[in-house]
Amino acid sequence: MMSGVMLLVFAIFLIIAFTLIYLAIYFKFDETTYTKRLQVMIEYIKRTNADEPTPNVIGYVSDITQNTYTVTWFNTVDLSTYQESVHDDRNEIFDFLNQKLQPVDRIVHDRVRANDENPNEFILSGDKDDVTMKCPAYFNFDYAQLKCVPVPPCDNKPAGRYPMDERLLDTLVLNQHLDKDYSSNEHLYHPTFYLRCFANGAHAVEECPDNYTFDAKTRQCKVNELCENRPDGYILSYFPSNLLVNQFMQCVSGRHVVRECPANKIFDRNLMSCVEAHPCTFNGAGHTYITADISDAQYFKCLNNNESQLMTCINRIRNSDNQYECSGDSRCIDLPNGTGQQVFKHADDDISYNSGQLVCDNFEIISNIECDQSNVFENKLFMDKFRLNMQFPTEVFDGTACVPATADNVNFLRSTFAIENIPNHYDIDMQTSMLGKIEMIKQLVSKDLSLNNDAIFAQWLLYARDKNAIGLNPLTGEPIDCFGNNLYDVFDARRANVCKDLGKSVLKTLNFGDGEFLNVLSDTLTGKDEDYRQFCAISYENGQKIVENEHFQRRILTNILQSDVCANIYTTLYQKYTTLNPKYTTTPLQYNRILVKRPKNIEIYGANTRLKNATIPKNATTISPVFNPFENQPNNRQNDSISPLFNPFQTTDAVWYSEPDGDEAVAPPPTAPPPPSEPEPEPEPELPSPLILDNKDLFYSCHYSVPFFKLTSCHAENDVIINALNELRNNVKVDADCESAKDLSHVLNAYAYVGNGIGCRSAYDGDAIVVKKEAVPSHVYANLNTQSNDGVKYNRWLHVKNDQYMACPEELYDNDEFKCNVESDKLYYLDNLQEDSIV
């Protein structure tokens, strides 16, 4: 007994030991690798053994991945691995016969590529030549996967039902792809299974209902003959979905036919006989039935034993409980019998493209592809203020799937498109001034990161001025004369149209001459400035520079004229600071044309000079001649001599002057009698330097070709004026509410809105420079820092820092110290041409 147990234990031990040894050998030994290496060695011996003996080690290419390959060296004695190395076939190739690596003399970029002429084939690029390889039958080469893949069962087949042959059963039901010849059974089909192909290329394996067989010719499920071996008159318990409530199936001559109950009777499917009753009497609530007077998409549903409700569906079906119900999706209604595919298209004034696809089968949605149509330019601003008025999608449908939208898969319907500017402080609408060219869109969606979007935008613009028009129709690109109540072009502000009849016709065309400019805030569109000579006109022909020239300045050196603010203020200051003793002057200083630079193109010459006190009274009855040679001349009693008729050295106390219009129409003055002898006068005090009003600088701040602000810099060429300016600037009067705007005093007529309904303006009141609070603010701004309503700084000469306001020429402004380094011999005056100069 004991010896038997020992033998059993020993046997078990041997079995376990043998199993372990076998498994160790099995896992260590790779039969496939052994076979490959044996074949490699045999092939090498066949080719070289006649010339030289078999070497101890042989190498071969054991693995290839694109341009990278692995060379495995093995011992010829036991086929064990000697070593492995990885190489790039673009640098070196392995010569099998010579068993060595050699430099390449033919660069191969793709070792494997598809054969464009036959999808079943692919091409291998060898070191010397190309080799064409074939995939198994019913397989095609897929370059993306670099392998042969099964041909889809619905490839090149329209939507519908197809019989299942042996190959389809193997691949779709048994899920096995066999490389065998199916031609011998190509006309044999499964009796109930069939292949359903959808419009999008998808497929499904379906089966006919019980008692039905798939007919390969009609591609429909047909009911099996149920009356075989049954007597005539036999009533079948078979109720097709289209059988009415008063119909039943009965056998006649071995075939089933549809029979109807007598009038006013229904067929009770429980009693299997015709009865005179309501269809709901025996079936109750929830029972469904159909009659001959309703459509194929309707049925009746019992509410109780006596009443029923007509139900209307997209598609009527019968469920597993043999009750009718609604199915289908309303989106499939437009397809024939609710089956097929519908490609969605988007089209607007600018572009068209496919946006998706709907695939339906029997009113059921098989697939619904909706590509991302969000506008790629939705939140993009160009040059910080322009939007492209175009709905360019993120994706389009290419026939199989959604792909990124490009200039190649989107159809452009027009050569131009509309551009809108964001709302601005002056309500300037620029959509009629310029349009975008389609080439702009093509470059913007090219995904070339090296391109600057703003530069592309500026490069591809069509301007109204290019067509010699005031405006362009944003939709058609054609020149227009009206667009609303008025029309103007900010890129060419020399003219504008005032329109009537809601923009249907032109009331009048304005051509702005000297002293006039486009005022976009005025109903008349006209502003007045005597100095303006279309200085903001854009002279660039380069379209990119035109749109980039948004804010710029024009500086003009010109003459001070009689009506200038420079002349008015400087004359007032001169009179105030040059008050003399009356006994030393015969007339007070008057401002006249001698004091200013004469206007250009007007030359005035004095033909003669005359005595100011020698004028002829208007009411004189007798006019004495200026020179009478027969008049008795007075004698000099002291030396008994006669005085000359004209003595150029004679002294007089008259003031000499020249009339502004010359002396051609003025008679010479009569000779004044010699003055009575007077005591020698006291010495005269030193007269002040003469008032000279000569030059001024004009600075125009332009928004494209529209002037917004004007800064006048009046040159002071008189010590009295310079000293007066210095005294005025050192004694500025500021209202308490305008303390934060006290530095407006550097520039007269400068305005700042400081919030809380307070507007401050600098002025000269004839006595001092004041910064006064306006009774009602001239302008109220939403953004105090920019003094505008859109966050854009238009006034380049008004500066805001830490809630403090300063007016100062840009070149004199020190932002770090918030200081204006005003020039002592200059007076500055600011005009808000758009908001303050409305005519």
UniProtKB/Swiss-Prot annotation:
User: According to the UniProt entry, where is the signal peptide?
Assistant: 1-23
| Comp. bias regions, Pro residues | 667-678
Q: Changing I838V does what? A: In strain: T3
Keywords in alphabetical order, please: Chitin-binding, Disulfide bond, Glycoprotein, Metal-binding, Repeat, Signal, Virion, Zinc, Zinc-finger
> Impact of mutating S295T?
In strain: T3
Q: Does the keyword Ribosomal protein apply?
A: no
Q: Where is this region: Disordered?
A: 624-644, 659-690
Q: Name one GO cellular component term.
A: extracellular region
**Glycosylated residues, chain numbering:** N211, N306, N337, N613, N619, N639
GO MF term set:
chitin binding; zinc ion binding
Query: Where is this protein found?
Result: Virion
Cystine residue pairs? C208-C221, C261-C274
Q: Which Pfam families match?
A: Baculo_VP91_N (PF08475), CBM_14 (PF01607)
- What InterPro entries is this protein classified in? BaculoV_Vp91_N (IPR013682), Chitin-bd_dom (IPR002557), Chitin-bd_dom_sf (IPR036508)
Domain Chitin-binding type-2, by residue range, is 224-282
Q: Where are the zinc fingers (C2HC BV-type)?
A: 148-197
What this chain does, per the entry, is described as: Probable capsid-associated protein.
- Protein name from the UniProt record: Capsid-associated protein Vp91
Question: Gene name, please?
Answer: p95
